[in-house]
Amino acid sequence: MPDSCVLLGDKPWQVHAAPGHDPHSVVLFEPQGGVLISADALWENGFGVVFPELEGEGAFAEVAATLDVIEKLSPRVVIPGHGPVFADAPRAIDGARRRLDGFVRNPAKHALYAAKVLLKYKLLEWQQIPLAGLAAWAQATPYFGMLHARHFAEVPADAWLHGLVAELERSGAARREGLTLVNL
């Protein structure tokens, strides 16, 4: 529960609300060692997709407030939900604020980022999939359809998916082998 403490091992960890990525997210902070378990609230190079924003609920301000909380805690070590443990929290917070500012100024950029993330995580599960199977999955997945309808309706769904695949290829996250998309 936020604003409480939990004993993990022999250390008391503070529980802090960290809405943004998810309205019910928390971070854990162990003040003696200055260790923060940040979940998806802060990564070394960003933060998690802000799902409420994609669904039409304003949550970018909550991400900013969560970054303020983390900054006030002044962690010496951050254990993120994704990526390596890191020690330069001020740099990570500054980078996260710049990314957030870009998303606030251009919400479509956030929606595109989210679509690529969702596709990449599914590709991590599959490891490879025929492009026809990918198209069938995208068409049958309600959240993916909502993302397209809400943020990219002006682009035909098949062209949008093709563009997402091309973005994953450009970034080195995937490659095509014939008619199959392969995770990298």
Regions found by a protein language model. Give the residues of each.
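Residues that act as N-cap/strand-start positions at coil-to-secondary-structure junctions
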Residues: 1-2, 22, 168
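Residue-level detector of beta-strand structural context in well-folded domains
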Residues: 3-4, 26, 172
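Metallo-beta-lactamase
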Residues: 12-105
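C-terminal regulatory/interaction regions
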Residues: 111-184
